[in-house]
A protein has these predicted regions:
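An alpha-beta-alpha
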Residues: 181-221, 227, 332-347
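Short, solvent-exposed amphipathic alpha-helices that sit
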Residues: 49, 87-101, 179-183, 205-224, ...
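N-terminal helix-turn-helix DNA-binding module of bacterial transcription factors
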Residues: 1-73, 350
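Flexible loop/turn connectors
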Residues: 11, 246-351
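Hydrophobic alpha-helical segments within soluble ligand-binding/sensing domains
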Residues: 170-197, 234-246, 268, 309-327
């Protein structure tokens, strides 16, 4: 009869791994990770089966996982949807830089799709490395709601909206509403009373907040506004510009809009290209305001008036909130500021 230790038998001369436990319990390795890290979204019977397999195999968590208990791994998990858009990438870069400056190593996991399954998979991935805290960049409202449903056993900071069902969730963002309001206030101060609002996709929280604030400010100033939808791309801005020009050519019954507020700089770039191709002068014929202050916005033709997001301040606030959560303290979470940058794409409307 063999007297081989079960851990050696399972591992064939090596310590048993997480996958060995998964095979013995007939579950996925992600489920084993959730049990090890006290993730609540595991059925009791499944949890018992995994714990039994751990005991039978003599499985021991590796050093990285054990640091979760002592909170000394120096790792902060960061989850984001894979995107090359300016806002999400700038947010990610700011968080990574702030983490490094404070002696932490950011561990990034990108979502393959915007779904609960993909979010859980990403959470499992970073938990396996023994993170101390988790930062989720929730660009879409649905991702904020899904994050609220998770209780991974470590502090969670959401960069994005605060879901109504999770008032206890720490959330941070750039003040999108203040930025959009500043853009419309600028146009109102120049004397514009007919403004087109080129909004981003409405499943993005930033796009919703910018549009809502812009519409409210237009109403406050008695500005007549028209909403068009884009998809953040310069191509959608160009298409919107072409559509506006076609509308103006077909409808001579009323005054034309004198300004456009685009919800990001890429769409503003597309607008400028469409107007230039049609011989419409900016800002003599129409003013254009963007949002983001992307690299090169001051080299657009003409240089773009836009809203600058303070991502450095956002990254600092995320780290402050994370460190406070790790210390069991609360911190006053205020939106990072947004700043109006006035350049040459805006001017008073023609009389």
């Amino acid at each position: 009869m063999s007297t081989e230790h079960p851990s050696r038998a399972a591992g064939r001369g090596r310590p048993p791994s997480l996958r060995d436990v998964a095979d013995r319990a007939q579950v996925s390795h992600q489920t084993v990770s959730r049990v090890i890290n006290d993730f609540l979204a595991v059925r009791p019977m499944t949890r018992e089966r995994v714990l039994a397999a751990i005991d039978e195999l003599g499985y021991r968590r590796n050093n990285a996982a054990r640091t979760l208990v002592t909170r000394r791994s120096g790792l902060i998990g960061v989850i984001a949807v894979g995107s090359f858009l300016f806002g999400p990438t700038s947010t990610l870069a700011a968080i990574q830089e702030a983490a490094r400056k404070n002696g932490y190593m950011p561990l990034l996991a990108t979502l393959r799709e915007n779904s609960q399954a993909a979010l859980i998979e990403a959470v499992d991935e970073v938990l396996d490395h023994g993170i101390e805290a988790l930062v989720v960049i929730a660009s879409r409202e649905s991702m904020g709601r899904r994050t609220a449903e998770l209780r991974p056993g470590v502090p969670v900071i959401v960069v994005g909206p605060n879901p109504a069902e999770a008032d206890d969730l720490a959330t941070l963002s750039v003040d999108q509403s203040a930025g959009a309001t500043a853009a419309i206030e600028h146009l109102a101060g120049l004397g514009h009373r007919r403004v087109v609002l080129l909004a981003g996709p409405q499943d993005w929280v930033d796009a919703q907040q910018r549009l809502t604030a812009a519409q409210r400010c237009c109403d406050d100033h008695g500005i007549v506004s028209q909403v068009l939808l884009g998809d953040w791309s310069a191509a959608s801005g160009f298409a919107a510009g072409r559509a506006l020009l076609a509308q103006w050519a077909a409808d001579h019954s009323g005054p034309l809009p004198t300004a456009v507020f685009a919800a990001n700089d890429h769409m503003a770039l597309g607008l400028l290209a469409a107007f230039h191709a049609a011989g419409v002068e900016v800002p003599a014929d129409i003013s254009v305001v963007g949002f983001d202050d992307i690299a090169g916005a001051d080299y657009f033709i003409p240089p773009l008036t836009t809203i600058r997001q303070n991502f450095d301040a956002l990254g600092h606030q995320v780290l402050l909130a994370t460190l406070s959560a790790l210390a069991g303290e609360t911190v006053d979470l205020t939106p990072a500021p947004a700043q109006l940058c006035v350049r040459s794409s805006t001017a008073p409307p023609r009389a």
